[in-house]
C-alpha cells in the first residue's frame, strides 16, 4: 500500500510534465491504469524526461507516419504526371467558372465592339471600296457609228487633199454636198489625213537621216585624198627637178572643230 508521502510526491509541482492522477491502489488493476496513463503521457510528449528515460523507442502510434510519408512520396510522381486530369475528375465545380466567365467576357466584348463600331456616332462611316474598273477607254454612249466611205468618195477626198489641205467653210460645204456627206465628216477626214501625212513625213525624214549617216563621223573626213599631188605639194613645198632632202616630220593627227580643221602632234 502506498504511503501518503509517495502520493504527495506524485502531485508535486516541481516535476516536469503534466500531472498524473494516482491510481486506485497497488493492485493489478491499479498497475494497468498507471501503465496506460504513462503510455498516454509518453505518446503526447515524446520529448519529455519520462520519454527520454524510457526505452527510447518511438511509440506505436507514431510508427505509421514514416510509412505514410513514404507512400505519399511514392504516389507524388504519378500524381504530377497525371496533370490536371485527376483534379478535374475530383473537382468538376471550378470547370464551370472559366466557361461562364469566358461567355460573359465574350458578351461584353461583343457589346463593346458594337459600341465601338456603331456608325454615325462614335466612328466615321465605313468606306465603300469601289470594284476595280477596267482601264480601257470607253466610247461615248451617244457616239455615232463610223461611216464607211465609198471608193469614189475616198478618191475625191484624196484628190481634194492633194490640191488643198485646209478647206474654208464655204469650200467644205460645197465639197460635202457634192459627195453626199456632212460637213463634219469632211472636216474629220481632213484632220485625220493631215495627221497621217505628218507621220509619213517624219518617217521619211528619219529614213533619209539613217541612209545619209556615214560609218565614221563627218569631222574625221579629209577634204582631199592623201595620195593626191596637192597634198604632197602643200606639205613638202613645190616640186622641183632636183628634190631636196626632206626633213623627218613627226606623225600628225587631224582633228576638226566646229570652225574648221586643225593639226596636233601625237605623243
From Swiss-Prot:
DNA-binding region location: 142-201
Keyword Iron: no
Keyword terms: Developmental protein, DNA-binding, Homeobox, Nucleus, Osteogenesis, Repressor, Transcription, Transcription regulation
Coiled-coil blocks: none
GO terms of biological process kind: embryonic morphogenesis; negative regulation of DNA-templated transcription; osteoblast differentiation; regulation of transcription by RNA polymerase II
Key word Repressor present: yes
Domain of life of the organism encoding this protein: Eukaryota
Composition skew (Low complexity), residue ranges: 62-71
Main location class: nucleus
GO cellular component, one term: nucleus
SUPFAM superfamilies: Homeodomain-like (SSF46689)
Cited Gene3D superfamilies: Homeodomain-like
InterPro entries: HD, HD_metazoa, Homeobox_CS, Homeodomain-like_sf, Msh_Homeobox_Regulators
Pfam families from the UniProt entry: Homeodomain
GO molecular function list: DNA-binding transcription factor activity, RNA polymerase II-specific; RNA polymerase II transcription regulatory region sequence-specific DNA binding; transcription cis-regulatory region binding
Segments for region (Disordered): 1-71
Protein location: Nucleus
Protein role: Acts as a transcriptional regulator in bone development. Represses the ALPL promoter activity and antagonizes the stimulatory effect of DLX5 on ALPL expression during osteoblast differentiation. Probable morphogenetic role. May play a role in limb-pattern formation. In osteoblasts, suppresses transcription driven by the osteocalcin FGF response element (OCFRE). Binds to the homeodomain-response element of the ALPL promoter.
Entry's family note: Belongs to the Msh homeobox family.
Name the UniProt record assigns to this protein: Homeobox protein MSX-2
